[in-house]
């Protein structure tokens, strides 16, 4: 067995700071063991290496210069002999009494057992990273040294770490290291947390040894779920609620038959006609001495566009008078706006085109006279009705036409409302009407001229009244001849000439 000094060197103790300065000289055999253990600047070997001084490669030659076994005492306590502390013969167990607080062993702390991590069971040993490949041995016992005399997993780390090849006297110049310097982190077995947990020494400062980090807890590890058994039955899924008509609604629907009668339907038609006979409620527009008197009063019967035809010059001359009538009678203008909206949504294709030209020509007249475009105006305020009616009637045709021309779809044209999307008369009508309807819906006080693509100081010269009707009828006829689809030809023809030919098969009425 090794001597006390050999044991202290094995534990990394600086003998200059220990309490064994005044130990008596040891015999030559002890000095020889000391030379063998201190033959290199590295840490000494483990207890197993010390018990077997001759390794597999044969005995190591003894160096010529022998280090003295006893060093002089420190200058701060000259002449004070230190009591030699006997080395314990066995490692202390958990129930053994602790040494005296003034002894070297109390400062060093309990030694860790020289056991390999393979002896530790559980999941910690399995989670340890694979050991680093050791460097080839250089002969003698140096090739068999492991770490700091321990049989831990990093047996070769002591050879590759430059900090462990430093002289023992430079490791802790301020005195002996604390006893808990090489203890593992809390809850970690010996040797589990030492690999890769040391922090590098601060440059130019004293080396400190902190507490090692413990391995990660098992709760932080990604654990894959167990594979599902394909033979296991699938979990039951709740059936969605049935989408049915509730009983109360069914009773309401059937109760219509109890109230439906021919006399009741006739009375409903009579009351509606009486309301429409005087839609303004006795407060119509003042039409005395007005060139617009025939159209300001209510009229029965269908609308005939030819009887209301006016030239652009007439509109420029008498348009401001009608504009002032709308602006000076807000209640009558509100009633006229509601009635116009209902009429526009029931027009056929030719009448809808005439309404589009009416709206754009009215805007051109206002721009010509520098009049504000008012959303409360009955003509401008009902632009959305013109747009909806035209889109409903032309949608089946425009799906094929716009795609063949490489233009945006109808819905995209109306939602984007960009002047740059205007490429022909069809896109012009829908983009301009969509921009006007959007301003009215937003409730702006006035609509600027730029909404119609008119710059500052410009007039609406690019639009001629009647271009909507003439242009859209032209593209219907042109595309009908160019497109090879029979369905497209039938659709375009029925839009222009809509008399009934085929499609309605019966009329069923069990109530009256």
From Swiss-Prot:
<feature type="modified residue" description="Phosphoserine; by host">
    <location>
        <position position="18"/>
    </location>
</feature>
<keyword id="KW-0010">Activator</keyword>
<keyword id="KW-1074">Activation of host NF-kappa-B by virus</keyword>
<feature type="binding site">
    <location>
        <position position="488"/>
    </location>
    <ligand>
        <name>Zn(2+)</name>
    </ligand>
</feature>
<comment type="subunit">
    <text>Homodimer. Interacts with host RBP1; this interaction facilitates the RNA polymerase recruitment to viral transcription sites. Interacts (via the RGG box) with host ALYREF/THOC4; this interaction recruits ALYREF to viral replication compartments and probably directs viral mRNA to the TAP/NFX1 pathway. Interacts with host ALYREF2. Interacts (via the RGG box) with host SRPK1; this interaction relocalizes SRPK1 to the nucleus and seems to alter its activity. Interacts with ICP4; this interaction modulates ICP4 DNA-binding activity.</text>
</comment>
<keyword id="KW-0945">Host-virus interaction</keyword>
<dbReference type="GO" id="GO:0039657">
    <property type="term" value="P:symbiont-mediated suppression of host gene expression"/>
</dbReference>
<feature type="region of interest" description="Interaction with host ALYREF">
    <location>
        <begin position="104"/>
        <end position="112"/>
    </location>
</feature>
<feature type="binding site">
    <location>
        <position position="479"/>
    </location>
    <ligand>
        <name>Zn(2+)</name>
    </ligand>
</feature>
<protein>
    <recommendedName>
        <fullName>mRNA export factor</fullName>
    </recommendedName>
</protein>
<dbReference type="GO" id="GO:0085033">
    <property type="term" value="P:symbiont-mediated activation of host NF-kappaB cascade"/>
</dbReference>
<keyword id="KW-1103">Inhibition of host pre-mRNA processing by virus</keyword>
<feature type="compositionally biased region" description="Acidic residues">
    <location>
        <begin position="35"/>
        <end position="51"/>
    </location>
</feature>
<keyword id="KW-0862">Zinc</keyword>
<feature type="region of interest" description="Important for homodimerization">
    <location>
        <begin position="500"/>
        <end position="512"/>
    </location>
</feature>
<feature type="modified residue" description="Phosphoserine; by host">
    <location>
        <position position="16"/>
    </location>
</feature>
<feature type="region of interest" description="RGG-box">
    <location>
        <begin position="138"/>
        <end position="152"/>
    </location>
</feature>
<dbReference type="GO" id="GO:0039524">
    <property type="term" value="P:symbiont-mediated suppression of host mRNA processing"/>
</dbReference>
<feature type="zinc finger region" description="CHC2-type">
    <location>
        <begin position="400"/>
        <end position="488"/>
    </location>
</feature>
<feature type="modified residue" description="Phosphoserine; by host">
    <location>
        <position position="114"/>
    </location>
</feature>
<dbReference type="GO" id="GO:0003723">
    <property type="term" value="F:RNA binding"/>
</dbReference>
<dbReference type="GO" id="GO:0006355">
    <property type="term" value="P:regulation of DNA-templated transcription"/>
</dbReference>
<feature type="region of interest" description="Disordered">
    <location>
        <begin position="1"/>
        <end position="243"/>
    </location>
</feature>
<keyword id="KW-1190">Host gene expression shutoff by virus</keyword>
<dbReference type="Pfam" id="PF05459">
    <property type="entry name" value="Herpes_UL69"/>
</dbReference>
<dbReference type="InterPro" id="IPR031752">
    <property type="entry name" value="HHV-1_REF-bd"/>
</dbReference>
<dbReference type="GO" id="GO:0042025">
    <property type="term" value="C:host cell nucleus"/>
</dbReference>
<keyword id="KW-1035">Host cytoplasm</keyword>
<keyword id="KW-1078">G1/S host cell cycle checkpoint dysregulation by virus</keyword>
<feature type="modified residue" description="Dimethylated arginine; by host">
    <location>
        <position position="150"/>
    </location>
</feature>
<feature type="modified residue" description="Omega-N-methylarginine; by host">
    <location>
        <position position="148"/>
    </location>
</feature>
<feature type="compositionally biased region" description="Pro residues">
    <location>
        <begin position="214"/>
        <end position="233"/>
    </location>
</feature>
<keyword id="KW-0244">Early protein</keyword>
<keyword id="KW-0805">Transcription regulation</keyword>
<keyword id="KW-1048">Host nucleus</keyword>
<dbReference type="GO" id="GO:0030430">
    <property type="term" value="C:host cell cytoplasm"/>
</dbReference>
<feature type="compositionally biased region" description="Acidic residues">
    <location>
        <begin position="16"/>
        <end position="26"/>
    </location>
</feature>
<keyword id="KW-1192">Host mRNA suppression by virus</keyword>
<keyword id="KW-0804">Transcription</keyword>
<keyword id="KW-0597">Phosphoprotein</keyword>
<keyword id="KW-1262">Eukaryotic host gene expression shutoff by virus</keyword>
<keyword id="KW-1121">Modulation of host cell cycle by virus</keyword>
């Amino acid at each position: 067995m090794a001597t006390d000094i050999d044991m202290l060197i094995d534990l990394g103790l600086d003998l200059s700071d220990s309490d064994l300065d005044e130990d008596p000289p040891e015999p030559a055999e002890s000095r020889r063991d000391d030379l063998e253990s201190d033959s290199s600047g590295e840490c000494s070997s483990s207890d197993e290496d010390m018990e077997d001084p001759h390794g597999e490669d044969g005995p190591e030659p003894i160096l010529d210069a022998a280090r003295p076994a006893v060093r002089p005492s420190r200058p701060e306590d000259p002449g004070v002999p230190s009591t030699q502390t006997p080395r314990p013969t066995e490692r202390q167990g958990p129930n053994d009494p602790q040494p005296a607080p003034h002894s070297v062993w109390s400062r060093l702390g309990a030694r860790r057992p020289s056991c390999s991590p393979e002896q530790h069971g559980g999941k910690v040993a399995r989670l340890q990273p694979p050991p680093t490949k050791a460097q080839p041995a250089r002969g003698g016992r140096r090739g068999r040294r492991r770490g700091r005399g321990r049989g831990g997993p990093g047996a070769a780390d002591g050879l590759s770490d430059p900090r462990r090849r430093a002289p023992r006297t430079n490791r802790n110049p301020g005195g002996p290291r604390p006893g808990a310097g090489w203890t593992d982190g809390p809850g970690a077995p010996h040797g589990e947390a030492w690999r890769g947990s040391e922090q590098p020494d601060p440059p130019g400062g004293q080396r400190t040894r902190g507490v090692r980090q413990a391995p990660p807890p098992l709760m932080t590890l990604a654990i894959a779920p167990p594979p599902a058994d394909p033979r296991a039955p699938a979990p039951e899924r709740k059936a969605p609620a049935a989408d049915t008509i509730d009983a109360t609604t069914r009773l309401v629907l059937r109760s219509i038959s109890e109230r439906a009668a021919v006399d009741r339907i006739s009375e409903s038609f009579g009351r509606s006609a009486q309301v429409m006979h005087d839609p303004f409620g006795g407060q119509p527009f003042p039409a005395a001495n007005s060139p617009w008197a025939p159209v300001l009063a209510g009229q029965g019967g269908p609308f005939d566009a030819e009887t209301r035809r006016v030239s652009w010059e007439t509109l420029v001359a008498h348009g401001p008078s009608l504009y002032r009538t709308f602006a000076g009678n807000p209640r009558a203008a509100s009633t006229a706006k509601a009635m116009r909206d209902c009429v526009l949504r029931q027009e056929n294709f030719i009448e809808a085109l005439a309404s589009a030209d009416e709206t754009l020509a009215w805007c051109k007249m206002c721009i010509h006279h520098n009049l504000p475009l008012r959303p409360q105006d009955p003509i401008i305020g009902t632009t959305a009705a013109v747009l909806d009616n035209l889109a409903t009637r032309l949608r089946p045709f425009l799906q094929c036409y716009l795609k063949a021309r490489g233009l945006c779809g109808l819905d995209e044209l109306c939602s984007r409302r960009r002047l740059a999307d205007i490429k022909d008369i069809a896109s012009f009508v829908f983009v301009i009407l969509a921009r006007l309807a959007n301003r009215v819906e937003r409730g702006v006080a006035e609509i600027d001229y730029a909404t119609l693509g008119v710059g500052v100081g410009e007039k609406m010269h690019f639009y001629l009244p009647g271009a909507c009707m003439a242009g859209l009828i032209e593209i219907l006829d042109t595309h009908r001849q160019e497109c090879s689809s029979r369905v497209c030809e039938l659709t375009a023809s029925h839009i222009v000439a809509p008399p009934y030919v085929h499609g309605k098969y019966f009329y069923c009425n069990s109530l009256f």
